[in-house]
Amino acid sequence: MAQAGVVGEVTQVLCAAGGALELPELRRRLRMGLSADALERLLRQRGRFVVAVRAGGAAAAPERVVLAASPLRLCRAHQGSKPGCVGLCAQLHLCRFMVYGACKFLRAGKNCRNSHSLTTEHNLSVLRTHGVDHLSYNELCQLLFQNDPWLLPEICQHYNKGDGPHGSCAFQKQCIKLHICQYFLQGECKFGTSCKRSHDFSNSENLEKLEKLGMSSDLVSRLPTIYRNAHDIKNKSSAPSRVPPLFVPQGTSERKDSSGSVSPNTLSQEEGDQICLYHIRKSCSFQDKCHRVHFHLPYRWQFLDRGKWEDLDNMELIEEAYCNPKIERILCSESASTFHSHCLNFNAMTYGATQARRLSTASSVTKPPHFILTTDWIWYWSDEFGSWQEYGRQGTVHPVTTVSSSDVEKAYLAYCTPGSDGQAATLKFQAGKHNYELDFKAFVQKNLVYGTTKKVCRRPKYVSPQDVTTMQTCNTKFPGPKSIPDYWDSSALPDPGFQKITLSSSSEEYQKVWNLFNRTLPFYFVQKIERVQNLALWEVYQWQKGQMQKQNGGKAVDERQLFHGTSAIFVDAICQQNFDWRVCGVHGTSYGKGSYFARDAAYSHHYSKSDTQTHTMFLARVLVGEFVRGNASFVRPPAKEGWSNAFYDSCVNSVSDPSIFVIFEKHQVYPEYVIQYTTSSKPSVTPSILLALGSLFSSRQ
């Protein structure tokens, strides 16, 4: 089944089930029998699904719930006695009251000026564009209710504050908004049945307001679920979520809201929307197993066509225009063979009547300096003449800001990180004698004395296809001294690439590795130990070590040698590109979604998969840093208590006696040794075997 068809079936199953299902139940109900991995890859479909973590009942573990999401809305300009939309929008022309259950005008014996049909040419075109033309009317209404905020009556915020039967609401019973507990609707009310706020849509006060809108009794009974779904979708789609997503948050798909600001979730989505840096350098060892996008440029422009993302033509010209903050929209075509052009709106990220998106490589501030073809984001502010000024740039008529684009980008990424608090939403800086605050939510900078605001813009630095070719062929080196270990073979340092050096069983280096392995696996026989020499990975690891040491006030970083079991088919890919838990297999997720490393080889042996009696295991060098007990829902270490932007470095199974470490940032790991061992066919007696037997017997005396 084509992917668009599978996406359509998942959407239909969810909408038929009330808009959301637990992940295992969703998989069970699908007709095509998707594997768990295939379903999770499918759920990365941008804008089609949201995965939320909801607390289980009583002592039950948290549950991953999949929700049907969509940018589809009712056209507000079409509503009312004088519909004002001429049909150029990408939204449904449908009577709002019909969606509620029954048109109040028809019930009163009057004519309704709004459309009551989904089969008009306009509506059918909109449904096909959004890939939902196969849904039934009820399924479509469910999708609209939990995604279109205009359809849901507003909850009175004043009612949810203060004491008294109506909280602090001055209108009391005359209030046109619903008086109901907002925390109940979010699934977060800790008071339950003892809550002083109403949890009932059917009480006389709320029911009267809902019936005036024409809501059916069936719809009223479903409102708690609808509001809960809408809350989770909004929380995931328009703000840095405090509920960890299903996938690790590092994607860089560019999506914007109507104000022109980048939605924070664009930095917190899965890496499946991120272009693979190794593929651009023609060196991705994971190949078709890589979870990132493989493309020949560090950017990719696409539009949504019938639920599937398609490439736009002339991406280089689009990218060049987008990199200019003065340009808000351009005309472009979807392919060279078509004569039809549509407007690509950079602020709204729309292409004609449908959605558009920009995929890109990782932000340059998240990678070491020598990584090529990362995305350099430039931050601008609009001056009093409407000209865009780059942060930190000298040589202009304006005072130089005390923060650069790089500083702003780092702060913005911290704000977009799941778990960041409200303090991370702003960045204070100076320019001349004035103090300012940059607000990442509103995308404005504010003068803290006069209160004046200026627009803020974030655009990438342009990289042409010729620039890509040049950077691919140039031998970019790390700007700093090489510090390879003195025991490495300096004649075996391919750059790029790696080489494995087989260690002599009589060497001290071999014995150190063997002793660590033998401590918990004394009856397993080591066939070979190889040292991995990858100059690029080693330099990245040393750079990461330096960064962590700076953040630690100059103190040494806790560095350990830990084991990681894997399948032999992934060994070369790991040696080339480091560990990636999405590709190399999951070692459980009890303490977070990351790469698992163990103090004991016996633990890692359980994950050393092999069809023969020969197994493979890594002994890695790991920067564990400061750690905290992990949790299955973590997609990165949590923030330190009392800090807004300071996070732990790793998660463990026990803080007092850790034996399992979860690493979320692969630069904290270097795959130092590959151990090949067997569970049978005892080899001839060697000094290492005698040493093993001697240590074993002495430990039993």
UniProtKB/Swiss-Prot annotation:
Modified residues (Phosphoserine): S258
Annotated compartments: Nucleus; Golgi apparatus, trans-Golgi network; Cytoplasm, Stress granule
Single GO BP term: protein auto-ADP-ribosylation
PROSITE patterns named in the record: PARP_CATALYTIC (PS51059), WWE (PS50918), ZF_C3H1 (PS50103)
Coiled-coil ranges (or none): none
ADP-ribosylcysteine modified-residue sites: C474
Changes after translation: Auto-mono-ADP-ribosylated. Phosphorylated by PRKD1.
Domain WWE as annotated: residue spans: 298-361, 364-458
A GO CC term attached to the entry: nucleus
Phenotype for I660A: Catalytically inactive mutant
InterPro entries: ARTD-AVP, Poly(ADP-ribose)pol_cat_dom, WH-like_DNA-bd_sf, WH_PARP12, WWE_dom, WWE_dom_sf, Znf_CCCH
UniProt-listed Enzyme Commission number(s): 2.4.2.-
One MF term in the entry's GO annotations: RNA binding
Residue positions where ADP-ribosyl aspartic acid is found in the record: D600, D611
The reaction(s) this protein catalyses: L-aspartyl-[protein] + NAD(+) = 4-O-(ADP-D-ribosyl)-L-aspartyl-[protein] + nicotinamide; L-cysteinyl-[protein] + NAD(+) = S-(ADP-D-ribosyl)-L-cysteinyl-[protein] + nicotinamide + H(+)
Zinc finger (C3H1-type): 94-119, 150-179, 180-202, 270-297, 271-296
Keyword Coiled coil: no
Keywords on record: ADP-ribosylation, Cytoplasm, Glycosyltransferase, Golgi apparatus, Metal-binding, NAD, Nucleotidyltransferase, Nucleus, Phosphoprotein, Repeat, Transferase, Zinc, Zinc-finger
Source organism, top-level taxon: Eukaryota
Role of this protein: Mono-ADP-ribosyltransferase that mediates mono-ADP-ribosylation of target proteins. Acts as an antiviral factor by cooperating with PARP11 to suppress Zika virus replication. Displays anti-alphavirus activity during IFN-gamma immune activation by directly ADP-ribosylating the alphaviral non-structural proteins nsP3 and nsP4. Acts as a component of the PRKD1-driven regulatory cascade that selectively controls a major branch of the basolateral transport pathway by catalyzing the MARylation of GOLGA1. Acts also as a key regulator of mitochondrial function, protein translation, and inflammation.
Similarity field: Belongs to the ARTD/PARP family.
Description of how the protein assembles with itself and partners: Interacts with PARP11; this interaction plays a key role in zika virus suppression. Interacts with ISG15.
Name of this chain's protein: Protein mono-ADP-ribosyltransferase PARP12
Organism whose genome encodes this protein: Homo sapiens (Human)
Organism lineage string: Eukaryota, Metazoa, Chordata, Craniata, Vertebrata
